[in-house]
From Swiss-Prot:
GO terms for cellular component: ribonucleoprotein complex; ribosome. The gene is rplE. Belongs to the universal ribosomal protein uL5 family. PANTHER family: 60S RIBOSOMAL PROTEIN L11-RELATED. NCBIfam families: PRK00010.1. One of its GO terms (biological process) is translation. The lineage of its organism: Bacteria, Pseudomonadati, Pseudomonadota, Gammaproteobacteria, Enterobacterales. It comes from Buchnera aphidicola subsp. Schizaphis graminum (strain Sg). This is Large ribosomal subunit protein uL5.
Amino acid sequence: MTTFYDYYKSKIVKKLMMELNYSSIMQVPKIDKITLNMGVGAASSDKKVLDNAVLDLTAISGQKPLITKARKSVAGFKIRQGYPIGCKVTLRGKRKWDFFERLIVIAIPRIRDFRGLSTNSFDGKGNYSLGIREQIIFPEIDYDKIDRVRGLDITITTTANSDHEARLLLSSFNFPFRK
């Protein structure tokens, strides 16, 4: 499949079984899915902004995003129920592993003034979320062709029962946590 998946199967599963005292391979936590979300506040006034965000997310993820719509009207933000306000992609299978590898090996090292990712971003159930301020850290995005720099949220959903297990899993992939 991919090098990260092969590495997970051959090395990480055995290592985590020993560390967590599991008797079955099925108990070992794994990455279930990766969700990319790009909220576009200016989409309510200009439809072209949302189209460009969809193109960026398509290039980053390799699959067509789902356009998210406002659940309720908010007068302060000038949006009404049903207005398109962003886009999201859920990655599973081979695309999940390909993206995860590109995120760790290529994208995160390109973040300006990077000092490691916070360990406080776990949700209590073993899932990790991080925010990217600039989509240009991904090599698929051509800096000269983007209309504006926009960020995105990345959520890594795992089958881990606790934050400790999820941190062990992600650290096994050399995920750059802050010391």
